[in-house]
């Protein structure tokens, strides 16, 4: 088979796959992201770029997972705040019964307009989710978390009763129902999930997420969020360094990464990301511990520069605008980073 015939055969196969399974189900890894898909910002400049379309896609299922206290709920609260800024209506299904309204408000969430439900069982939670999505008036629904979606049979049973795969069956059935409604209403469904360890794994990662495999298949975007370090002010811990990896992405090439700071009480540090991405793209100059922008020194030490940008929002916005214009370059840098890590 000649090269031309091969290219035609591949193009025909790709067209057939897209026709059968939808646009974005297959693409070349280095292909330009599909910019026609509507997106909602995550509140993180770096993560928006790693996702390839400027945020999470509308009309899709998103899974955010990671260890305890890694920033999963913080990230989803930022998502709600960004959706509300665009005039969207959001719902929070609090299966864990752990949402802190005061913290949500600090992150920019309009709690007066946020619809909240604290269901008793997994079936109730997913029925409420289904009803809200089918209404067509909800732009984003958060389910916190999959691990807390306990089936009714387990709640009504005795302690110690074996409920083999009942949660996995519940999730599989619910996602089959939800997928079409989510796509039709252009709603974003975000599932927060926890990590568990598989027993007896000799090779590969022993980590897995709760609720069976259905969510892994139905999710268009899966985001792995991890705490990689602490941010200290002298001896006091004031935040955590966070790394996110887009482990699945059906709307843009996957495996991109982003780093950001989560400051206790205020959420994702936009200023920290502007500094880091600005230095990567040579927009902000770094010489030793000094940082400069347009040949003017803006501070010594990263924390001091963050404070400077907070006090001078016009400079922060100016640098952010330039970073977004050069976002394609950042995408390539992330791919190069991944290649280096794999080598």
UniProtKB/Swiss-Prot annotation:
It holds the Pfam family RecA_C. Transmembrane segments: none annotated. The keyword ATP-binding applies. One of its GO terms (biological process) is DNA repair. Keywords: ATP-binding, Cytoplasm, DNA damage, DNA recombination, DNA repair, DNA-binding, Nucleotide-binding, SOS response. GO terms for molecular function: ATP binding; ATP hydrolysis activity; ATP-dependent DNA damage sensor activity; damaged DNA binding; single-stranded DNA binding. Gene3D superfamilies: P-loop containing nucleotide triphosphate hydrolases. ATP binds at residues 66-73. It is found in: Cytoplasm. GO terms for cellular component: cytosol. Belongs to the RecA family. NCBIfam families: tigrfam_recA. Can catalyze the hydrolysis of ATP in the presence of single-stranded DNA, the ATP-dependent uptake of single-stranded DNA by duplex DNA, and the ATP-dependent hybridization of homologous single-stranded DNAs. It interacts with LexA causing its activation and leading to its autocatalytic cleavage. This is Protein RecA. It comes from Rickettsia canadensis (strain McKiel).
